Regions:
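A short beta-strand micro-motif common to beta-rich folds, especially ectodomain repeats
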Residues: 1-7, 119, 159-165, 169-183
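Short, hydrophobic/aromatic beta-strand segments
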Residues: 12-14, 127-135, 172-174
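Edge beta-strands of extracellular beta-sandwich domains
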Residues: 10-18, 185-193
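Surface-exposed binding patches on compact interaction domains or structured appendages
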Residues: 2, 54-60, 78, 95-98, ...
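Beta-sheet-dominated interaction scaffolds and their linkers
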Residues: 17-18, 23-124, 166, 199-202
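Extended low-complexity, intrinsically disordered segments associated with secretion/export
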Residues: 7, 103-105, 138, 144
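Internal, hydrophobic cores of structured domains that mediate oligomerization or house catalytic pockets
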Residues: 161, 188-201
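Terminal accessory carbohydrate-recognition/targeting modules of carbohydrate-active enzymes
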Residues: 68-71, 77, 149-155, 166-167, ...
């Protein structure tokens, strides 16, 4: 620029260096969504705290209207882990976490005693998952109604249930255990042959 003084004009050379704003994390400095995704994989609690901070939109979304609108839509979700998971899936930084069960068809013969069994659930991929477990049959007693990523040992969770013999009628009894995430569902069909009740009064 030109500096004007009483002694005349002087051309002054200058340059600006723009320093991109970053945030310090346990993995080092982070300033893009690739860095953030890596943080989610190794320290989800730290990532959640950053995701909900004022710095997230400023540093990681950088004025991108599409990303900011997506973030705002998901921000008020009751479960912040689900919000963060869906955000990363929507921007294609990860695939949706899926799950499977060991056996969808189960048959039992019950004769005078309760029976305990379990469903082996295996998750595929990394990230957060919440599973809702439902069974309307009164003779099936479920151990859990909700399962999250924290309940798994490695990639496996064993869901226990009990068949209550006292609530069975004679002949076949049918039940469905439904395990659902927001993107996937598994249905376990159960058939129980209950003991026939013999009337000796006559």
């Amino acid at each position: 620029f030109t500096l004007v003084t009483n002694a005349g004009e002087k051309e002054v050379l200058y340059s600006f260096t723009a320093v991109k704003e970053t945030v310090d994390t346990s993995l080092g400095k982070a300033d893009n969504l690739f860095h953030f995704t890596n943080l989610v994989q190794v320290n989800k609690e730290e990532a959640v705290s950053l995701y909900r901070s004022d710095k997230f939109k400023k540093i990681f979304l950088q004025g991108d209207d599409v990303l900011n609108n997506l973030y705002d839509v998901l921000y008020d979700r009751e479960n912040v882990y689900e919000s963060m998971e869906e955000f990363l899936i929507a921007i294609k930084k990860k695939s949706a976490l899926t799950f499977s069960v060991d056996n969808n068809i189960r048959d039992y013969n019950i004769d005078g005693a309760n029976e305990k069994d379990s469903i082996i659930i295996e998750k595929n991929g990394w990230g957060y998952i919440k599973l809702d477990v439902q069974c309307e049959a009164p003779f099936i007693k479920m151990k859990r109604g909700i399962i999250t990523s924290d309940d798994f040992i490695g990639d496996v969770y064993e869901l226990d249930y009990i068949i209550d013999d006292k609530l069975l009628h004679g002949g076949n009894n049918y039940a469905y255990i439904i395990i659902s995430s927001y993107s996937h569902q598994e249905v376990i069909e159960i058939t129980i042959n209950g003991k026939e009740i013999v009337n000796d009064s006559g």
